[in-house]
């Protein structure tokens, strides 16, 4: 997300990210690259995540196939440096962060090393300063003028008190096109919990479903539902005052569309024809940055991080665990072992027929 948002400030290095265990992801990232001029940064908190380590093994094999000392082409960002060294990465090329830093809150840690490579040290420090400025604002501002607190209250009221189960994040800035996906993990992994932080029952709902696409594209996809659908969906618009390029007319049209959508959602429109009637009263918020740069992006990310934590506190959940993710990892190990053995595991009580079907039909191209 951040590398995409700050692509106009890239230093000249080609930086590609691989997160999916689907082989197509790594294949696409390696396309056109020279092993002698490629550095891999393996980013893993535990250095045991199956997807990450499988991709790392494949990347290492790719370097070895070129007859190169692979250890000179790898670095690690991890909270478990011992595991990285045991895997073969030299200690001096292993960058450690605290084990209490969750992945979704780790952009400002050494996990941000690839971003630093992309935009340069100075720009990365500007992003960190933007985060620190937002941190200082949170600590010093009164609740009534505290941006993360006000933002958290807005999302909490919509999701919990008004019981509106989703929120659409629509950046009217194409370089922020990955912001909705970033917030999906930040918000839903943090606050998508079914019990209180003490293990007790919750008397209310928790995290909304976060989704979205950049404007104006979304206007021609899901905005019809936002305006006239039976399910009310809060919308969060994010944009910038200053354009990113030289086309001022295009930027003015972009902002005009955003403001028009905010007005239409809030005010609606009357008509004798019920098909053309808009009820309005559809909640929406607008976040405007002066410009999209490293400092403002850092402040924006920190604002969302603080807001997420405040929402979790209001909901009474622990925003800093993710046992649902851990369950998926453990079940994936059982499924992977079953595929390796060619026999469905008895522990797969609900998906036993599916595993048997897959094992019967699976084929690999030679």
Predicted regions and their residues:
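Glycine-rich oxoanion-binding loops at beta->alpha junctions
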Residues: 2-39
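Extended, hydrophobic alpha-helical segments in both membrane/secreted and soluble proteins
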Residues: 1-2, 26, 42-45, 49-63, ...
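Non-catalytic terminal/interface segments that mediate subunit docking, oligomerization
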Residues: 1, 5-14, 195, 229-236
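C-terminal helical/tail subdomains of lipid-metabolizing enzymes
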Residues: 285-342, 348-365
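Acidic, Ser/Thr-rich peripheral helices and adjacent loops at domain boundaries
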Residues: 244-276
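Active-site phosphate/pyrophosphate-binding segments
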Residues: 62-247, 327-333, 340-365
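Short glycine-rich or small-residue beta-strand-to-loop segments that form or flank ligand, phosphate
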Residues: 40-46, 166-173, 209, 287-290
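Short beta->alpha connector loops at strand-helix junctions that form conserved
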Residues: 18-19, 44, 95-100
């Amino acid at each position: 997300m951040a590398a995409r948002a700050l692509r106009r400030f890239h230093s000249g290095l080609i930086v590609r990210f691989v997160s999916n265990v689907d082989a197509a992801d790594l294949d696409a990232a390696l396309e056109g690259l020279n092993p002698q001029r490629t550095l891999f940064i393996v980013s893993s908190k535990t250095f045991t995540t199956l997807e990450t380590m499988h991709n790392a093994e494949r990347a290492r094999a790719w370097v070895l196939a070129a007859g190169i000392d692979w250890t000179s082409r790898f670095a690690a960002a991890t909270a478990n440096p011992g595991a990285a060294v045991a895997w073969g990465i030299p200690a001096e090329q292993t960058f450690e962060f605290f084990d209490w830093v969750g992945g979704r809150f780790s952009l400002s840690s050494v996990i941000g090393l690839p971003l630093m490579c992309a935009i340069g040290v100075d720009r990365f420090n500007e992003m960190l300063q933007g985060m620190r400025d937002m941190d200082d604002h949170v600590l010093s501002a009164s609740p009534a003028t505290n941006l993360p607190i006000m933002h958290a209250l807005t999302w909490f009221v919509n999701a919990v008190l008004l019981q509106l189960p989703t929120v659409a994040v629509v950046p009217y800035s194409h370089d922020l096109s990955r912001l909705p996906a970033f917030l999906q993990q930040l918000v839903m992994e943090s606050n998508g919990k079914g019990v209180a932080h003490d293990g007790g029952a919750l008397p209310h709902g928790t995290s909304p479903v976060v989704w979205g696409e950049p404007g104006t594209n979304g206007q021609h996809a899901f905005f019809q539902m936002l305006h006239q659908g039976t399910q009310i969906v809060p919308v969060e618009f994010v944009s910038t005052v200053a354009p990113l390029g030289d086309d001022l007319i295009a930027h003015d049209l972009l902002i005009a569309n955003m403001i028009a959508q905010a007005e239409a959602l809030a005010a609606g429109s009357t008509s004798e024809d019920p098909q053309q009637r808009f009820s309005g009263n559809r909640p929406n918020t607008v976040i405007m940055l002066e410009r999209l740069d490293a400092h403002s992006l850092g402040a924006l990310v920190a604002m969302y991080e603080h807001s997420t934590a405040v929402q979790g506190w209001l909901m009474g959940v622990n925003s800093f665990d993710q046992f649902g993710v851990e369950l998926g990892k453990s079940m994936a190990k059982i499924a992977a072992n079953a595929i390796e053995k060619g026999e469905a595991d008895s522990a797969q009580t609900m998906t036993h027929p599916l595993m048997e079907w897959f094992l019967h039909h699976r084929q690999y191209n030679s």
